Amino acid sequence: MNFQDALEAARFAEMPIARKGWNGKGMFVYHVPAAAYPAQTGVAKRVFGENAKVEYGAYLALKSADGKVYPWTPSQADQLADDWEIVTL
């Protein structure tokens, strides 16, 4: 499927997505909706307050092959690819 369809599956159906050609085992992208989290860093605590909740906008996250999660932005190649698929967990 194309990226637009994959992105809609991630955003509206809460389905993890990946490209068929990705080499990393267990890698996938998922949508993280906007939310508020307790301030974690010194900067956030100074700006928003020690016990504040910081509002974050929605973003895409990548579960990488090393098991860590990172914010993710698609490359042009990712956006134009037609090899996206829904991942079964």
Regions found by a protein language model. Give the residues of each.
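Catalytic phosphate/metal-binding cores of nucleic-acid and nucleotide-processing enzymes, i.e., regions
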Residues: 3-45, 52, 65
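Short, compact, well-ordered microdomains
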Residues: 56-89
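Glycine-rich, flexible loop segments associated with nucleotide phosphate handling
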Residues: 50-56
